[in-house]
UniProtKB/Swiss-Prot annotation:
Residues 1-81 are annotated as: Domain I, interacts with DnaA modulators. Belongs to the DnaA family. This is Chromosomal replication initiator protein DnaA. It comes from the Bacteria. It is found in: Cytoplasm. The gene is dnaA. ATP binds at G154, G156, K157, T158. GO terms for biological process: DNA replication initiation; regulation of DNA replication. Pfam families: Bac_DnaA, Bac_DnaA_C, DnaA_N. Keywords: ATP-binding, Cytoplasm, DNA replication, DNA-binding, Lipid-binding, Nucleotide-binding. Its main location: cytoplasm. GO terms for molecular function: ATP binding; ATP hydrolysis activity; DNA replication origin binding; lipid binding.
Amino acid sequence: MENISDLWNSALKELEKKVSKPSYETWLKSTTAHNLKKDVLTITAPNEFARDWLESHYSELISETLYDLTGAKLAIRFIIPQSQAEEDIDLPSVKQKHAHDESNHLPQSMLNPKYTFDTFVIGSGNRFAHAASLAVAEAPAKAYNPLFIYGGVGLGKTHLMHAIGHYVIEHNPNAKVVYLSSEKFTNEFINSIRDNKAVDFRNKYRNVDVLLIDDIQFLAGKEQTQEEFFHTFNALHEESKQIVISSDRPPKEIPTLEDRLRSRFEWGLITDITPPDLETRIAILRKKAKAEGLDIPNEVMLYIANQIDSNIRELEGALIRVVAYSSLINKDMNADLAAEALKNIIPNSIPRIISISDIQKAVGGVYQVKLEDFKAKKRTKSVAFPRQIAMYLSRELTDSSLPKIGEEFGGRDHTTVIHAHEKISKLLKTDTQLQKHVEEVKDILK
């Protein structure tokens, strides 16, 4: 076969005969061939849940089918679009399409074909970020430069960045657009120093028209990489090239980020994305169902949208889980079936009531302090500091009064509790180790 896409399409036709229609529609139909390297065929699955299911339930069947077609024993590897964006694409059609990139020693733009402005669902939480992204795509380096988009995981930051890239290339096929994560930027920079190819690295990223860099917060604490990105930023900005940056937090909240970088990130426009509201979540589910060719009852979409309000990735994953569950037990989808399918991933609707004793036990576990020491008169730092953390969390996570908290810590005065709360609050603004420990305690208490 000339092209691995042809090979995979032939394999899909055979697989369609071997599995039930619901199974084929749910798991196999939306897969695509990514590349074939050293007898390993990489297949792209639409999401993590589908990838994991394919790996555990269909790898052997797929290998057998491919052997029947080719006579070769191929190993099968599954990836999702996000991880695909970090790899080199080997499809001949793609190589030919981007020949101009290779001639300039530039990386592939690595854009996910599913992440466009047309597939982006607009809601109150992302409307401004969408408008800003579209403005940048329509007039690179003229509207907002840089554009800094921040928000939680799975809310659409990466989608908007890819959409910008697609739009620019569609309207200017010769534009040099590069998307990468800050982690990849860091790794390539380190390798360039090791291999004495620093000049090649700089030329690679300072000669693009649009640079889309994801998860910039991972540059925190990496002084040399920040230095390199600072100069890359300057070179692109001075040449009026567009820079788009994403992060899980605004520039001012990224710890150990150099002030000069923080200042430059604030030169253009900073916009955030917040979790989608109910109407937007329903719209996202409808668009996902339509894209996957799934017929989902309204009551099921409403149930999922009401239960999953954290991010889009979990929302779409829940939908796929319900569809899979329905096909496996061979029952029609309804709200009751959705509840059964999602019972292990939906948080308990009754929030856990945290007690001061719970907090003392959790802090004691992290800091190796015995429960009785929280009430004792010991003032050694190894006990006193964890005790202050426990007082702080008791104030933050319970409804207990100051005197009540003091009483639970060996009858201490309420002013001691106030002092502990103020001290820990102040330290949390700068002490990353303390931040980590407090989050660890909170995770234990969940």
